[in-house]
């Protein structure tokens, strides 16, 4: 695993110890960021990396100029790998050691919003739909923001989840990528998005 582009290009990243984490392959990561580059990239944007694993997607976004990145994972080996990878690359990110659902709730309670969200849960465990639903309900994705979901063969990514509408679906071997765009929403009577 390595950083593909940006200020930390070529740096090797550490995978979490154990066999429970499946880091995003470099060729899939290159394809994801090629899609994002065609849609204003990541420079100056706020990024959320859920089920972060080694943090490769969020760290790649930081290397490409994202203004901030928050990494959420509850596995100790993953948290250790994210910290080590941030140190190796000299990049700075916020690391939350908790399940994705709790991370979404905590970030929403703090009024945070993100322009790019990466969701890369363990394949075949049914995390995609509830995570997209929680993201939409919490309104963590800024209007026009993009959510990139990585999933395995045989898992479905719904065409629409609330205000998140699938724009792109691609397949790279056994890995599938779905990219959602957050529709603009009106504020409620209290001025909240």
Predicted features by range, described:
Residues 1-193:
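Class I S-adenosyl-L-methionine-dependent methyltransferase catalytic core
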